[in-house]
Amino acid sequence: MQEFIKFTDSGGGAREQVVDTGSVVPFYLKFPGWPAAAGILLGSLVASSTASRTSGVVTVTATAHGITTGSTFVGYRFYYPGSPTLAAGLYDSILSIPDANTITFSAAGADFSSESINSGTAWTTATDLTTMTIKGNLLKDLSRVIIRIGKLGSTGGATKTVTETFGGSQLGVQTATSNSISDTSTGFRCYGTNKQLAFSYSDGGGGTIYQTLTKDITVDQSLTIRGTITAAGEFLALIGAIVEIIP
């Protein structure tokens, strides 16, 4: 026996899908505002990094910043650690990385010159890179959520960490130093409406972490991807992220 499941697309149009009675149909959510045809770049920069802005173009001067030069990350969203005139935050987007000491990106505002970035220190603080809201009652007993992430980073000795959180609590964590390129999956299964069992693994390998959370899935909860780099002159990039939900 078959049933019809009706969906509404972003333009308000109706769609129907035929499924067997009792079937569970997974669906996928994109992180809102994810940059088109690009990803998100976090760089630790270096001590004594400076920035200036001319006609909406910010030039970061950071000697041996460690980020791949050329066009690889042009168009990526960039986390800027902040300076007196320009607030810390994510900016769209990188315009150029012409050499090992320079990064340019777009940010509207008044011109300024030679401002110290992050009070003259490298950026090694855990940083939220993207987030979405899982609406209350979207998940049910035995629902499963999987966050699939593609990431890459510099090959120096600093630890590059990606952490996923649900409702502000850690779900999974993936760390790498010299081999920081991987596809990772982190997720959880719901038990009732107030318990989640979380798991995490990389490149199809076995689970690397397991957590028990007690979030109320009848109310809205945040789902966030966070990055951390432990030393100067390195970077971490999210090249893609999507959330699979099996209701």
Predicted regions and their residues:
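Small/polar beta-strand repeat architecture
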Residues: 43-125
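Surface-exposed molecular-recognition determinants
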Residues: 2-43, 123-247
